[in-house]
């Protein structure tokens, strides 16, 4: 390791090679500097032997003080007195830094000690919400002896930009951390690149627990008002029982909890599912008249098999369980049909149970489920049949709220004042803007920088963009990485001169902090100008732009002029580990924004997530999945399953975000999203783009034996009222978009039957299309009786399911060395309607009298 020292020892930077140090010195225009070669000498154990083989690890964690008002120098001094003695005894080195309510600690020790040390002090009553930011190997000692002296931020630096950025990043991580499941936190908060993580094969027990007939609650106004409270109760009950029994939550969606357990905890999994049902029964008996919690019933399905926990997607990523998760969901649906609270599949599950529990179970017969060519055998615990859906439907019909008032009432979105309405979709561009030739700049090619776009919009809007917008004083903090490292003084000077002039015209003050290529910026100004800054925030000179904090401000804190500060002078000289802390916090913030929906990040930035108001609004729902996914992946390797899911989810996310939509969930191979209610045309455009991508992918691999040559999809679109609410309070929270999701999933499944890739409900979506699309772009589907819908016309949008299934069989046959079975060409389906001109008044158009059958839930 090589250390570059300049400015009389005030600046220090480490490099792996001598060439890297020389390149940095030349690019930064450093004149007087010295380079030292440092070799890490092995420690000597107590017995005199060498401990060179003992790898060191660095543990970095962030906590909240239980009593922030008591977090003063005296409080930290008492902690320092005890901690210094203990850490000297075990040879731990590191430091602690605190600011008001947040404490950040770094410890360097051997492989075994940090984990045991973390487990030892994590129950500390003076701290809460322990968040690991780093727990990985380190090549050598980076810090001296344990030090907690003068560790308050005010003692480290008085620069307002550094104080603000560090504090806001700590608050953002502490808030968004609770939206991640346990497995996600382990990887993401260490700042690892999500796209570089390979899938993790495993054998687990997976359960689907869902609220029975939850969709009917959303169709009754008196019950819709209590939807947020019902979901919060359900989330808390699942978290308590699943994590308390050694399992982990895989995903929450509308009224459904997906969880997983190790194979040696099958008994605990069954016990936890039964306990959830018993807890809901106890809650029902304790509710006051008019409470919707009295209508909560659960049913579950359990399945054991191969799978993997993997990262799918890169633009907006998520963890997903594959590939038997689809079968588990259908087993849960079968439990409702068989009128049993718990049903599990696979003889392997029966073998994993203990002798006592194995004697209690009984077979429930062989049943055909969707996605399986052969019937599957299921098991259940003996007991009286209970038609939960019928019992619940009777209770719903007789339900009267009376004088009961829930704690989290749902409010109509349109009824809120404009300044109180939460953002529904993220309109921030995710890619780099293309360079363009702008008139007025001499017709020459310009780099379309952030400040140039800002001044261009300001000129188009008039003398001042704030004259017609919200002038509320607002603060914005975001971080980004420089595309060119290191940033020379010449580049920083050019950035400073242009930005100062542009921001002065918009009454924006603030500071841009540069820490060796890491930018942290704090802005203060009128809300309309700050929001515009946020919407066009990315240019070719910076990447990984992440919003850290955005909230109203009482008065300006930053200096009157916009300044650029390089954190290579006094700040880092006062406290050298500051750069390391800032870099690690930035990595964690960037990873969190990748996995947490953008709208959730905006809602929680500067707000207490417990105070988020549940709202109800109309949106266009989108649901899509890979066709014949079960048969495609049964004989494919897990790496191939991950590859096609990663490709499909990336394409779907890109299409949705490009058209102004918001992705809700990625569940296995299924993706759900929504668009604003007045943006049905964009939803159709996103669906067309996704289907076109799948068709082109198949054409690209038509002559190759590859699973990507069999990827197809259908897309369902439906308009419905949804409830957006913050749910959960026991360590794991979820910002849900609850609607009649079963209906849009039904439309997605119906595309396979009617032969059209895109299905839209009538009149929900069709009435929101443009007149030209209604008259020329949609085709009736007479086979869709239970749920009237239309297909999007076009020869390129026809879905030939039989051809795709034959391709999957041919793929598996070619891989196994068998000759593919040649089947005679099947006749065209009688219900196929060729694309054509269908007007509003055609007989295929459904009347409003058919709406009575749309409430049927198909899961």
Curated annotation (Swiss-Prot):
InterPro entries linked: A/G_cyclase (IPR001054), Acylphosphatase-like_dom_sf (IPR036046), Adenylyl/Guanylyl_Cyclase_3/4 (IPR050697), BLUF_domain (IPR007024), Nucleotide_cyclase (IPR029787)
Residues covered by the Guanylate cyclase domain: 620-748
Superkingdom to which the source organism belongs: Eukaryota
Signal peptide: none
Extent of Polar residues compositional bias: 846-859
Keywords in alphabetical order: Cell projection, Cilium, Flagellum, Repeat
Limits of the BLUF domain: 56-149, 473-565
Subcellular location as annotated: Cell projection, Cilium, Flagellum
Pfam family, one: BLUF
Gene3D superfamilies registered for this protein in UniProt: 3.30.70.100, Nucleotide cyclase
Transmembrane segments: none
Region entry Disordered, spans: 426-445, 835-859
Subunit structure and binding partners: Heterotetramer of two alpha and two beta subunits.
Additional observations: The 1224-5/1F strain is deficient in phototaxis. It is not known if this is due to defective adenylate cyclase activity or defective BLUF domains in this protein.
Protein name as it appears in the record: Photoactivated adenylate cyclase subunit beta-like protein 1224-5/1F
Organism: Euglena gracilis
Underlying gene: pacB
